[in-house]
């Protein structure tokens, strides 16, 4: 994982919109239609107080001044990582993680989205307080798990200085007025929030309805977090959604099955790498055993796969 992530970071566009990497070679993502690499000014808050991501980040985080000589911008996030990293794909197929997803969201669980957050020391951008969900807040069937959850695998671990903070219990309180919470606190330091602190290799879980965010990484420690998100099938089937991670669409059964093939490819990629491990049995695609083999054709098939994310 460390080698793969380092290789992806090295081949990222040198700046927003660039087609070359820092070494002048062809950048990853240059031929993708889906959003892939995101850049921001060092220690800035690119989302807070804007209409981006459906305006779900209503308040702005404090933006420390970067050190003299800092670059004008830095890459802090990339989406669709399973097409760029075989190690990330194999992580996605981890039988224990998928078993947890099934236990939480049911055996017919679906994908949501994958992302890798890169918080370089002294450079990493903040992520303003928000709740991930945007679709089902007014549903009479809303409960504490309606908008799914994210696994957050930590490559180097995370600290209070560079990690995600979360407001415990907020996932069960519906849509909250985050701007009012910040105003009541008198700053972006919400007194109710606690940090997610992990060692290298730990995997945290975060409910997508929880109020959470992270401060600019003014620390000396790097954080790399691999997010793997999952939904209940009932929360996405025939639902009109999108607009944050993917274009608005109605998620019919065909789209869900098409997107879920990434789980099957990941399971097979992991089976090839770890033949003595018992692979996860993914029920929704069990009707076509052997259909999704990880090979060169599969690699071509998942190009731009995140165009079909299932964002709610």
Across the structure, where does each feature detected by a protein language model lie?
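Short, surface-exposed loop/helix-turn segments at secondary-structure junctions
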Residues: 58-62, 131-134, 179-192, 222, ...
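A structural signal for short, well-ordered beta-strand segments
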Residues: 114-116, 151-153, 226-230
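Short acidic/polar capping segments at secondary-structure boundaries
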Residues: 116-123, 133-134, 156-160, 170-173
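Non-heme Fe(II)-dependent double-stranded beta-helix
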Residues: 1-129, 135
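Non-heme Fe(II)/2-oxoglutarate
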Residues: 15-20, 203, 210-312
